Amino acid sequence: MLTWKNNLTPVSEQFDDIYFSPENGLEETKHVFIKGNDLYNRWRNWNIQNAFCILELGFGTGLNFLTTWKEYLEYKDRFRLHFISIEKFPLNREEISKALSIFSELVEIKKEFLSSYQDLIPGMNYFQFLGGKIHFSLFLGDVSSALCEISGKVDAIFLDGFAPSKNPEMWDKSVLENLKYVSKKGTTLSTFTVARMVRDSLSFSGFKLEKRPGFGRKREMLIGSYSDSFLESNPKEKPWCKRAYPELQIKTVAIVGAGIAGTTLAYSLSRRGIQVFLIDPSGIAKETSGIPMAISHPHLTKIPGPISLFTLRAFRYALSFLSSFADQNFFEKTGLFHSVTQEMDSERLQKGIENHKLSEEIVFWKPIASKFQNGDFLENEPGVFFRNGFWTRPESIAKKCAEQPGVEFIKGTASRIEQDGTSWKLLIQESGHEIVANSIIFCNSHSIGKLIASLFEGEEPFPIRKVRGQLISLKETEKSSRISNILCAEHYLTPSILGEHILGSTFDEFDLNPLPQKKDTDRLLEFVQNKYPSLNFDSSCVLIEKVGLRAQTPDRLPILGPVFDPREFRKIYKEIDLPKNRNKKFPNLKTIQGLYVFGGLGSRGILSSFLGSEIMASLILGEPVPVESSVLEYLHPARFLYRKVRK
């Protein structure tokens, strides 16, 4: 709850403290945090490839972030900026807008920021601004939990919670000591307070501290630098999924597979200044990614779990990305209504909203006998409505991603890989041409493990299976043309786009026939006729039939991360969960430098690919990733073998 001092300066009623100096909050930020971390001098000499990463404890009104954004503009052509902030009690758009209204210098930046400051979820929320030059990760939650969830090291730290006497939880000894897990030699910090307990905790964590003149009426402030050359790893991370940082600068990457995973990854890497070779024998999005239309919404579970946590994060970033990237004719936020079904029963859906603490801005429950966007059509249909559920045309998005500068498409089959010093060679079967790159990333659907297996005596370490899906398109009827939202139940129906609906999709793990089958078309028609009889669809409405073979993992989450030797994994971790080894320290998993996989997206290719590509790009460059470390563990390529050795 906010009050306003002189109707200008925001004051927290909960902590009885001001958010920024009433004298000049913007100049205070520059003095304490920008100059306190020597950012102007450091930015002038920064590496052009790696993002400069700042961690802030206490987002508040966003003043520090927007001021940093403004000061960074002079350097935006030299490097990217990644700003991570933690906030337990976030302000809404109106409160932030009013709080920052006194700073005329920030008007345009504030406008761009607030246009994306929506659909927030507990935990990590990832944004990009300034055409991908600025990455922003906002963690909503407790600071002690958040620090254990940041995967990566930062370059500077802004400590800006309310005063220690007002908000002791943020300045707790354990919180400040955990800063070592996100620090590396040369990481700096600054803060407005010089309280003794703060200095003692930071010194204990490995920071060399120095007092400096404070801002305005504050006599002193504190700056520091992390002096330990040893990289502390988060003790909560399991040894088999601890990150390995690149030993060399990455300049070239070969991506095998030009579906939606490969093309979105090519886009993410090329925007970081990396030369990308994109390889596929069929062309861009010519296999399963070539479906005419895909729909996306988060997957709600009754209690927060791996699938719901990942898909919520992926959904909100996909919305943000596509809103600025996609042309109007291949992306639209129509909203999506999901009816109650046997699998998605009313308790699961309602408890899912409650337990994930989702606002009505994201999703709300529609009870029976209530009106809806489509008039009386769904009046007696209970379910949930995702306000920004959307449809896309995957092939169009994939092609636009592949057209970016720095992406070279090569039509051909990757037939052999071998290490060449610090690089990798990849042979193109048709031409005999060899591609040399610092890294190879396998995004080739259900063939993801085939080339890798040659390194491990033929063993494919990733359990990906084919799942057949068939969809059909339907000519609109007079009544169906009025539907404005995507409708989901056991199958889904899109609104009419240019006179055509998409009705999908079947799910078959056993019949892998690549050709359309009448029985599947009949099954889909039977569904839509029984579920929505008033729409008057019949067999004469069928326009096209399309089949795709999804690449799916046993837990229906993508495989994303470094390649490892499964033989070594079994040797090292085969007894990791035995009671006798409870206190034993196991070595970190040694991954194969320069080899990565990104696949197994299943039926959520569009939903997963945009955030997945950003995660992968961050891993390859050794930067903080835009999801929690616990979510990263859900996606790790070694998770299946870990589960197997535990049995």
UniProtKB/Swiss-Prot annotation:
It catalyses: 5-aminomethyl-2-thiouridine(34) in tRNA + S-adenosyl-L-methionine = 5-methylaminomethyl-2-thiouridine(34) in tRNA + S-adenosyl-L-homocysteine + H(+). Its cofactor is FAD. GO terms for molecular function: flavin adenine dinucleotide binding; oxidoreductase activity, acting on the CH-NH group of donors; tRNA (5-methylaminomethyl-2-thiouridylate)(34)-methyltransferase activity. One of its GO terms (cellular component) is cytoplasm. Residues 1-227 are annotated as: tRNA (mnm(5)s(2)U34)-methyltransferase. Its EC number is 2.1.1.61, 1.5.-.-. Keywords: Cytoplasm, FAD, Flavoprotein, Methyltransferase, Multifunctional enzyme, Oxidoreductase, S-adenosyl-L-methionine, Transferase, tRNA processing. Gene3D superfamilies: D-Amino Acid Oxidase, subunit A, domain 2, FAD/NAD(P)-binding domain, Vaccinia Virus protein VP39. It is found in: Cytoplasm. Residues 256-647 are annotated as: FAD-dependent cmnm(5)s(2)U34 oxidoreductase. GO terms for biological process: methylation; tRNA wobble base modification. Catalyzes the last two steps in the biosynthesis of 5-methylaminomethyl-2-thiouridine (mnm(5)s(2)U) at the wobble position (U34) in tRNA. Catalyzes the FAD-dependent demodification of cmnm(5)s(2)U34 to nm(5)s(2)U34, followed by the transfer of a methyl group from S-adenosyl-L-methionine to nm(5)s(2)U34, to form mnm(5)s(2)U34. HAMAP family: MnmC. In the N-terminal section; belongs to the methyltransferase superfamily. tRNA (mnm(5)s(2)U34)-methyltransferase family. In the C-terminal section; belongs to the DAO family. This is tRNA 5-methylaminomethyl-2-thiouridine biosynthesis bifunctional protein MnmC. It comes from Leptospira interrogans serogroup Icterohaemorrhagiae serovar copenhageni (strain Fiocruz L1-130). The gene is mnmC.
